[in-house]
Amino acid sequence: MKMKSKFSVFGAAVVSAFIGLTPLLASAGEVNVYSYRKPKLIDPMFEVFTEQTGIKVNSVFAKKGMLERLQSEGANSPADLVFTVDIGRLSDIQNAGLTQSVNSARFEENIPENYREPKGHWFGLTTRTRIIVTSKDRVKPGEITTYEQLTDPKWKGRICTRSGKHVYMVALTASMIAHHGEAEAKKWLAGLKSNLARKPQGNDRAQVKAIKEGVCDIAVINHYYMVKMLKDPEQVPWANSVNMVFPNQDGRGAHMNVSGMALTKHAPNRANAIKLMEFLASAQGQEMYVQKNGEYPVKAGVPLSPLQNFWGPFKEDSLSLAVVADNRAAAIRLADEVRYND
């Protein structure tokens, strides 16, 4: 009932926003994609896939309202595949009953088990890690090395983060629940809140800017925002003002998340969709993805970007993202209980 109520308020506006789009028609030589990722990132890969297979890829950029659109279209949806970012968005689509399972030996070969839904409802395509960044001027190298140390009282008034209920922060908190239990995770989140320099606000890049401006000394961000800032002349000084810390390298490793894909429940071009999924999980598809967006490949042995090679290898947390997804509701509740955003 809660989901229906939410859709009644928001869904009509979302659906109307798509009315002007040309319908995607099912075809034996096509595959239809709803994508959270921007066309400039994924279209080059689709073009190569089409050249190799003759299968045309029709894509719709749907950063907002993807789940609501799929719900409204129901069995008449032309969508075969969904591309999105964060385990939360993938699991939300699955939990809404909008995906179907896929069995493929190529996925088992190319995608580690912790980046796959156990029954094949979603698959990670690239990984991103949630790193700690610290002021080069005000924090000594090695002074903070773990997520747990973010609660140290010596950092009081010195940390910036985005909203505690944003999907990236929710996933991190969910991983803390998985590793430490809910009670300890709540203490951790409350301790982090007590060390904030300001009310949570802005995106990940805004936290790095705040360090450059002296608002805070430490922030928690997704690693690829460093790549994005280094490509923007205005933001290069922000990136150059911080050191990157891959957390928990002497323990479980850095928290990981994914961009991923899922086969829709009513996919009209199922066979073509699976071919595209397998291409994107292949060495060729993975390398194209990684070179475009600065994220890491899920497939082992794929060449990294020059910047990733400069950063060097790091230890990844091997926690299953399906477990992270299961703890998301509790993580959101904890953010409310500690009044993280207040």
Q: What is each stretch, according to the model?
A:
Residues 28-92:
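Early extracytoplasmic/lumenal segment of secretory-pathway proteins
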Residues 34-37, 99-108, 118-119, 122-123, 134-136, 142, 148, 218, ...:
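Short beta-strand->loop
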Residues 77-82, 100-132, 148, 158-161:
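A structural signal for short loop-to-beta-strand junctions that line the ligand-binding cleft
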Residues 87-98, 117-145, 173-174, 256-262:
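Periplasmic solute-binding protein
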Residues 168, 175, 179-247:
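Ligand-binding pocket segment of bilobal, Venus flytrap-like solute-binding proteins
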Residues 259-318:
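Mature extracytoplasmic/periplasmic domains
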Residues 306-342:
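Extracellular/periplasmic bilobal clamshell ligand-binding domains
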